């Protein structure tokens, strides 16, 4: 059975489409989001609400303690167990999310960076980043993998550390690692549907509205509750978009509106990076929203794509 995947940048309606397809196909949703895995962070990560789920079971949401360094390798293993369980019950898995790296790791099934499931290499590299600084780590990447370094910004901590992680565990550059893993048959066959806005201004408005709704739903209270629970400020989860800015506001380092504006800006920048990543994948079938979302058109497009691949 092919997995149905709904991908796209933040704020483009993936949750809605994933639920609609799961209802139509008799399926269950598996979240593919690097931040929704954490407990107690439902508002800032835009985890689906009970109302949005419409009774459809959702997996890989709120499964990890935010103190943990939850790696992509661990996600791939945990999500695969969910997928296999859904398949064993004769149900259709619907993968929903915008984290392209996590999606690729789940579908490929041949590990990530050699399978650093315990996060040992990543934890060591994170510690070195804190002690030595980003410039030193970036210089190290330039020495061992100049090709990858040439495509990254000095401040792109996540991808710099990922490239170093791959090298130190496998002895290979990212290009070499990717070339080798592409030769291995994927764990799952899939049909991929992408959602995005045709006009950039429409995407901007959708993201801004999404952030406003998060704040209205209690984002700042959620962050305060995490702090009150004893969650350290420097854990990876608290550096996510929305949480870092909320911390600045709660600490008196930024005005409330300044924090909200910064969340909107970073969210738009993140959406742009998501699109750049996902558009590299020629297997994704894209549906572009006009200024007004016409839901039946999107559902008809998606249904036609699925029927083309024998999914019904």
Regions found by a protein language model. Give the residues of each.
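Phosphate/pyrophosphate-binding catalytic cores of soluble transferases and nucleic-acid-acting enzymes
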Residues: 1-312
């Amino acid at each position: 059975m092919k997995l149905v995947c709904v991908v796209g940048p933040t704020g483009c309606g993936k949750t809605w489409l994933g639920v609609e397809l799961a209802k139509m196909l008799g399926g269950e949703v598996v979240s593919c989001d690097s931040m929704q895995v954490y407990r107690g962070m439902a508002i800032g990560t835009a985890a689906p609400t009970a109302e949005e789920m419409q009774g459809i079971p959702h997996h890989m949401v709120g499964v990890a303690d935010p103190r943990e360094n939850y790696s992509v390798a661990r996600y791939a293993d945990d999500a695969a167990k969910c997928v296999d369980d859904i398949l064993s019950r004769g149900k259709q898995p619907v993968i929903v999310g915008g984290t392209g790296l996590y999606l690729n790791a789940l579908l490929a099934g041949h590990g990530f960076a050699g399978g650093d499931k315990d996060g040992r290499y990543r934890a060591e590299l994170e510690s070195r980043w804190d002690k030595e600084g980003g410039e030193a780590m970036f210089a190290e990447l330039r020495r061992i993998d100049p090709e990858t370094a040439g495509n990254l910004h000095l401040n792109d901590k996540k991808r710099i550390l990922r490239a170093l992680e791959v090298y130190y565990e496998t002895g290979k550059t990212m290009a070499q690692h990717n070339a080798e893993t592409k030769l291995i048959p994927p764990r799952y066959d899939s049909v991929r549907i992408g959602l995005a806005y045709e006009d950039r201004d429409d995407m901007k408005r959708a993201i801004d509205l999404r952030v406003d709704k998060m704040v209205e739903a209690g984002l700042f209270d959620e962050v305060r509750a995490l702090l009150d629970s004893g969650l350290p400020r420097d854990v990876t989860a608290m550096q996510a978009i929305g949480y870092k800015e909320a911390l600045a506001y709660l600490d008196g380092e930024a005005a409330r509106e300044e924090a909200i504006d910064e969340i909107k800006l970073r969210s738009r920048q993140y959406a742009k990076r998501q699109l750049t990543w996902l558009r590299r994948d020629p297997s994704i079938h894209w549906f572009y929203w006009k200024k007004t979302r016409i839901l039946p058109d999107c559902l008809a497009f998606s249904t036609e794509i699925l029927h083309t691949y024998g999914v019904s």
